[in-house]
């Protein structure tokens, strides 16, 4: 048997060895990035995580949970992976990052047909009541830029419902997340319009503090391979093809 085959076999067995700590993987309910489809995890980040696990010979389960719960689980101990986190200086002190895996577009939405009226009363839109998902980069960006963020919700779906019921006037979220949130809220995506574009944010896999650096490096290496052979780009196109080009 060739030596190279034995080396590969040993590496695969080591990565899947019973003594290797299980990785608890959590995705947030944010279609099309990660979400539950008929009880099974799906989405861009989920598919990418499965591809990386295939390369590493691992089969750790992926659970879809609310962002607040995922964050608290990651803070509780090692061997936790959050599938989609924006890298910030504060989070760098708490987590280890692999990526980026895609770029999020930070957008403010208004009910379609209301924007002209809103601008007449407040040209800069800074005084309007606004909402965003709690703890998200969208909420942090809006607040940091001086917008009047009066409501933070547990999910993008709840934020969409509140916007459409006029509980607030502006909804800050990711352009890639808006269609799924609107549909789950019982509305069509074309019932809202873009009020402001606030830039982009790179999204990463985030491992909790204390997770083995060797495991994090293995994920980073597998992601580099998927990027090099074009697989990452194919997965991105599959799940984000609906986004308009700017």
Predicted regions and their residues:
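Extended ligand-binding regions for polar small-molecule ligands
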Residues: 43-55, 115-116, 205-242
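Flexible hinge/capping segments at coil-to-helix
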Residues: 110-129
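A ligand-binding cleft/hinge motif common to bilobed small-molecule-binding domains
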Residues: 71-72, 85-93, 169-190, 195-199
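Short helix-initiation/N-cap motifs at beta->coil->alpha
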Residues: 61-72, 151-162, 199
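Ligand-binding clefts/hinges and TM-proximal coupling segments of bilobed small-molecule sensing domains
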Residues: 59, 137-150, 190, 223-246
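Extracytoplasmic small-molecule ligand-binding "clamshell" domains
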Residues: 18-94, 132, 229, 239
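Periplasmic-binding protein-like
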Residues: 27-29, 104-107, 183-223, 242-246
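N-terminal signal peptide c-region/cleavage motif recognized by signal peptidases
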Residues: 11-17
């Amino acid at each position: 048997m060739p030596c190279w085959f034995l080396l590969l076999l040993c590496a695969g067995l080591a990565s899947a060895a019973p003594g290797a700590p299980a990785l608890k993987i959590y995705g947030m309910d944010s279609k099309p990035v990660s979400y539950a489809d008929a009880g099974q995890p799906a989405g861009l980040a989920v598919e990418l995580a499965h591809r990386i696990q295939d390369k590493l010979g691992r089969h750790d389960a992926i659970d879809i949970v609310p962002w607040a719960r995922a964050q608290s689980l990651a803070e509780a101990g090692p061997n936790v992976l959050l599938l989609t986190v924006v890298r910030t200086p504060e989070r760098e002190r708490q987590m280890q990052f692999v990526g980026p895996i895609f770029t999020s577009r930070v957008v403010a939405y208004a009910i379609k047909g209301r924007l002209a009226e809103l601008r007449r009363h407040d040209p800069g839109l800074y005084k309007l009541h606004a909402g965003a998902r709690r703890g998200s980069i969208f909420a942090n960006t809006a607040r940091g830029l001086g917008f009047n963020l009066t409501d933070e919700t547990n999910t993008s779906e709840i934020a969409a419902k509140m916007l459409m019921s006029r509980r607030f006037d502006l909804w800050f979220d990711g352009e890639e997340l808006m269609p799924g949130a609107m549909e789950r809220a019982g509305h069509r995506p074309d019932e809202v319009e873009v009020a402001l574009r606030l830039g982009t944010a790179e999204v990463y896999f985030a491992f909790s503090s204390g997770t083995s650096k060797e495991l994090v490096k293995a994920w980073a290496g597998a992601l580099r391979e998927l990027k090099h052979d074009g697989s990452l780009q194919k997965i991105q196109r599959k799940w984000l093809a609906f986004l308009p080009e700017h």
